[in-house]
Amino acid sequence: MYLCHHVSSRKEEPLALATTLPRPGLEAHREAITLAFPELVSRLTGYIGRKLTAYVAGVKDVRSVDGWIKGNSPYGDAEERLRLAFQVVRTLIDHDSPRVVQAWLTGVNPELGDRIPLRLLREGDLNLVGPEVMGAARAFIAGG
């Protein structure tokens, strides 16, 4: 018996790995820069609560947070800090529960030299601590 092996003349397309592999934080980044501030604050408080949102913004009580949700303008660098905090939280929330994310934000973190992520986001130079905290969040996701 003679077997004939058919060879296709069609070229196989290369796999587009860059578009098919998950990229943790990409959607979070997009939302952090495009959401209207009241919506961003509302979502952030839904994830981590009003007190932690107020803390990272550097305000003493939640009345400011409530005002921002209603459309009041933030002052100082509160908006920048909250947008970065949202990006971090949104990246983590895709992989864990709000309770775990809150614990991650408020606990000492070995990836950050045993510093607390939320405190860095509140007090640090965002150009320096932003990449550090995002890197620690990605490391947490990768570590499972």
Residue ranges and their predicted role:
Residues M1-G144:
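Non-transmembrane "mature" sequence context
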